[in-house]
């Protein structure tokens, strides 16, 4: 038998997850459906956060390459792109897991899949048996 919710938010990006958490805090039985497979939307998963992480690491690399000019000798500075990408992935994972933690803490039910309206009272989750 399908679960019943007071409200279901389709989309777990910055607008969706904040909305779902707040609705649950206000006492509504809340679900959130996200198709990406991890919460946070484009910004957190493939946009703003990963880009800023890589920009920050690149800036540090550039600074380190110029340390000698100000009297700091460190030897050869090399870029390890694999480690930079792992660091970026770690930053994204920490933040997406943080949103999942907030869902658990605030009792928001999280469904992975693509949500769409079946009718005015039912939502189908593609890739799931849940309605």
Outline where the language-model segments fall.
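Glycine-rich flavin
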Residues: 2-5, 21-28, 34-131
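The conserved SAM/SAH-binding core of class I Rossmann-like methyltransferase domains
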Residues: 10, 33-34
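N-terminal Rossmann-fold NAD(P) dinucleotide-binding loop
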Residues: 16-17
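Beta1/beta-strand and adjacent pyrophosphate-binding region of the FAD-binding site
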Residues: 1-13
């Amino acid at each position: 038998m399908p679960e019943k919710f007071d409200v279901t938010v389709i989309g777990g990006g910055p607008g969706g997850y904040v909305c779902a958490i707040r609705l649950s805090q206000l006492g509504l039985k809340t679900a959130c459906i996200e198709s990406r497979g991890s919460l946070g939307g484009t910004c957190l998963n493939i946009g703003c956060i990963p880009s800023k992480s890589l920009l920050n690491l690149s800036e540090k690399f550039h600074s380190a390459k110029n340390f000698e000019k100000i009297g700091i000798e460190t030897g050869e500075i090399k870029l390890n792109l694999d480690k930079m990408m792992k660091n970026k992935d770690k930053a994204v994972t920490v933040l997406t897991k943080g949103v999942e933690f907030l869902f658990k803490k605030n009792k928001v039910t999280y469904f992975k899949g693509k949500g769409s309206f079946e009718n005015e009272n039912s939502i189908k989750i593609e890739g799931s048996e849940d309605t």
